[in-house]
Amino acid sequence: MKVGVPSHGDFIAGLSVAGLLLPEAVAYAGIAGLSPARAIFAAIMGCLAYVLIGRSRFAVVSPTSSSAAILAAALAALHGSANDPGQIATLVVLISGICFVAASTLRLGALTGFISRPVLRGFAFGLAITIVVKQLPTIVGVPVPTGNLFDLLIGLGIAFPRWSMPSIALGSAALALLLALRRIPKLPGALVVLALGVGVSAAVRLPGVTLVGPINMTLTQPALPPYSWELYSRVVQFTLPLVLILFAESWGTMRALALRHGDSLVAGRELGALGLANLASAAVSGMPVGAGFSVGNASEGAGAASRATAVAAALGLVLLIAATGPLVARLPAPVLAAVVVAALIHALDPAPIVELWRLRRDVVVALSAAIAVLAFGVLNGMLIAIVLSLAALLRRFATPHVARLGRLGTSHDYVDIQRHPEAVAPSDVVIWRAAEPLFFANAERVLTAITTGSGDCRLVIVSLEESADLDSTALEALIEFDASAAKRGVRVQLARAHDRVRDLLTRAGADELAARTSFSVDDAVDAVRGAATP
């Protein structure tokens, strides 16, 4: 798919997206505590760089709420008296770009699998609450010392007598208007609200309402902090989770939109495209960039037909900032905070977590991820969420259901007799199947359960259809299980064993057990009965 010359539809879609990019860029820069110019330059360069090798026609690579929040957490942890936050931010973006390119070169696109969708949903939910709460001081018009979420809420409560009613009224009105304008998808509601906010501040004196102030759009030469092993190593520690979340978020957006329209994408190529976009952002002292969900859906809704939409969006953003840049100085800060809150409304929807509860799958993991972000901060919360996700997966694999199988009618199919009472288990043979692959954490437990459940039966079949491979622990446990069964006069037959498993048994010296394998359960039943016949 070539970038091509922007069509009329792409140009219109690009302008519509640019109308969303400008307020979001200014808002996300505020989340990170950086100049809006950094986010604007990042959005321009991200869009232009991505289309060079990226393949998603709907992706608009620009600063995202999650990347801004993670960057803010990193800057808060790394910023010291001798460290310039702008330089640290540039270093974070540069290392992010390098990590993306390295991951693409090493074909590590599958790494996003370490962040399950429930974890990502819980993380996004907790992150959205965190960002929204941090906008409250701006909306109520009182400065509150930054700290963890609970300290901020306590500070807001203490400062209640000093809350500014004009600021609250303006922020609330802006948020209500933003939500109302969502009923007109092709109208850039955020841009309309920002324009109205500028108009109100110019026409009416607003006591107690803070203004954004002038934006310096001068392009400066990027600078990195002086080299220090301690600083640079800590930056890498913060950057790796940022890269993981950025790609998980971006790939989720790209893939969902691609599947919706029958497009095909390659994870490795998109990793490289995101790497190039972040390197381009670092070259202009920008912020981390990725393909955000809200902007990607806005691009689709505006009628984007090719990647040229992103080019048109970048050019539209240049025109917008040239025409309206001086006016942004008059923008009331509560209006900008309302734009941030409105941009995160979709992430505050509990419906995906409620659906997990309804399905009784992974809801604890999702809620734990959200609570971890709220209690321990963005970065620590994300790491805790990933660990919880892996722990939940390990627990499920370590305690699999071991089903006893029976024949379904006169067919050759063998199914779980607990789930299918109509299935008939053979009277002279017990057939077992673990619901998960055998590996070091469950092999002993599964084989012990089979031994216990088989009772006095002398013919035992173990179906290994879920085990495409075995680690050394599972291999040894299987051989020991067979040897123990033989001492008790029990004959073991393996069904549906994969070629790799048979090869492993042979290499381990268990040739006789490797020979007692069948391609189907039905064949295994015939084989074990035949061997038992004198």
Predicted regions, residues:
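The feature marks cytosolic C-terminal regulatory regions of anion transporters and related permeases
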Residues: 346-508, 512
